[in-house]
């Protein structure tokens, strides 16, 4: 499910509050984001910051909320200049402001694009994975500064690669066995994976 990130700046003692059933990793976002924003050359709000992650009944896990929260804080300040569009954003932030790769990019992009979202900001390291979901506009970023710049200029978003879908009728399988896996020195789990793939006629990619 998609998570909506909202940020509100309020009067009060400077602090960052997170609501919305966040786990420990998400709550740690507060400190990472503060350092990343400042070290990226932006001014962190002096107001009390409220971060809402909705739907409230869905447990939020992982560090992938760092980048959307940071951009939400920058957008909450006046004259951010960000595009007025719903954008999928995922990424973990280092204290320096650099963006780290996260898991689940393909699934998140698929869900977001199916729901009508047109744009996605993802870590540069996840860019190829995101582009495997075709038909929308995606930008890969290496830092918070790059992400903020991208949200000010819609032309930064490149069209994802179109993936040609092969008809199942054009796929054929050979009944010939090229090699007996019993004679190969492979880990047992890999042999098991090969057996399952062959039995179910599934694709299997082995690297290394």
Segments predicted by a language model, with ranges:
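Peripheral, non-AAA+ core regions of ATP-driven protein-machinery
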Residues: 1-207
């Amino acid at each position: 499910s998609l998570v909506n990130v909202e940020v509100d700046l309020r009067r009060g003692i400077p602090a960052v509050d997170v609501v919305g059933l966040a786990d420990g990793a998400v709550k740690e976002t507060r400190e990472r984001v503060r350092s990343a924003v400042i070290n990226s050359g932006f001014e962190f709000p002096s107001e009390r910051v409220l971060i809402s992650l909705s739907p409230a009944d869905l447990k939020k896990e992982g560090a992938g909320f760092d980048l959307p929260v940071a951009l939400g804080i920058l957008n909450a300040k006046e004259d951010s200049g960000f595009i007025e569009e719903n954008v999928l954003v995922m990424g973990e932030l280092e204290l320096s402001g650099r963006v780290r790769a996260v898991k689940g990019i393909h699934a998140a992009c698929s869900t977001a694009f199916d729901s009508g979202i047109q744009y996605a900001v993802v870590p540069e390291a996840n860019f190829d994975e995101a582009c495997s979901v075709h038909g929308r506009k995606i930008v890969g970023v290496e830092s918070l500064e790059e992400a903020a710049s991208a949200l000010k200029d819609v032309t930064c978003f490149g069209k994802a690669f179109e993936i040609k879908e092969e008809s199942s009728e054009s796929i054929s399988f050979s009944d010939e066995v090229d090699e007996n896996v019993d004679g190969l020195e492979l880990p047992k789990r890999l042999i098991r994976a090969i057996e399952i793939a062959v039995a179910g006629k599934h694709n299997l990619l082995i690297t290394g």
